């Protein structure tokens, strides 16, 4: 992997250093505001005229920014967060870095000019004329490439730069190790000296990220009410369990519903059959002829012959009043026989009728005063007519 510093990046570094110098000189009161928008010709003339008139005050002022460069670097880096080089790698970091600066060969730093533009020209010339060392590094695939690596951070009090290889950097024993930006760091077995603090020793991953950009929309939002969300989810789970139980019960009753439908269809078929049979029946009302006019009904009774079959001679059934007594089946009987039969069975019929009417009254009225009075009157009745009259009065009182 090769890190080459372009001219634009050098300009940015020089401009950052000049801003730090201006700030330090302004704090020391050893400089004045440079005239804005001076042409390049005037800058060169001013630089030539001031070569012989530099004082020790300016020399001391030029050394002062080296001690105050750490806070100024952070200030300038924060003021320029969006600057990046064309190849996606910027030497200006947007965050503070800690580490040790490995020193190379000392370069003679010229005394600063009195003007702002003069300092810029001196720094550009010094950066362009300084020779670069080509060194060999080995990447993660085992291939050897000629490249140079620039190490930033650490003690910035001295104005020195270092070009070191990957193997030399891995052998350094330091209490402060940065993450080496996008290069590999093989790790350190040394325990951190500070157990607490903002930055500890961090081991870099062996996998190089394809890009340094981060999609902001992929970052999850902060959950202010995580407990309430969990409670809501648990409540939904309970409701879902209840719904599933009810659905299971409904599925179990599905067979019963289908069986009920089949029974209903059978009942409908049977009812249709019964209705068809009823239409074929003719209900006859005895004593009421079907085709008789009103005139024929209003006629007086006529003498008609009566044929009695199966009994033989009926003269023995004729009583003294010249009448014949018939039983419920219209059979002629002796009048004395009927009376004897009625007297023998009258008590059994009355007792059965009393029991029937008493149970009916208890079901209708329950245990109340009216029910007791009706039961007493039934017990005191001796004939069927009395019991029937009590029954009729009880039914009328309900309606």
Curated annotation (Swiss-Prot):
Q: Basic and acidic residues compositional bias: what residue ranges?
A: 45-55
Q: Residue ranges under compositional bias (Polar residues)?
A: 82-97, 105-115, 136-147
UniProt keyword Phosphoprotein present: yes
Q: Which domain of life is it from?
A: Viruses
Q: Which family does it belong to?
A: Belongs to the rubulavirus/avulavirus P protein family.
* Entry-linked Pfam families: Paramyx_P_V_C
Locations of Low complexity compositional bias? Answer: 59-71
Keywords in alphabetical order, please: Phosphoprotein, Viral RNA replication
The coiled-coil segments of this chain are none
* UniProt-recorded name of the protein: Phosphoprotein
Q: What does this protein do?
A: Essential component of the RNA polymerase and the nascent chain assembly complex. Also required during RNA synthesis.
Q: State the residue spans of region: Disordered.
A: 28-115, 129-149
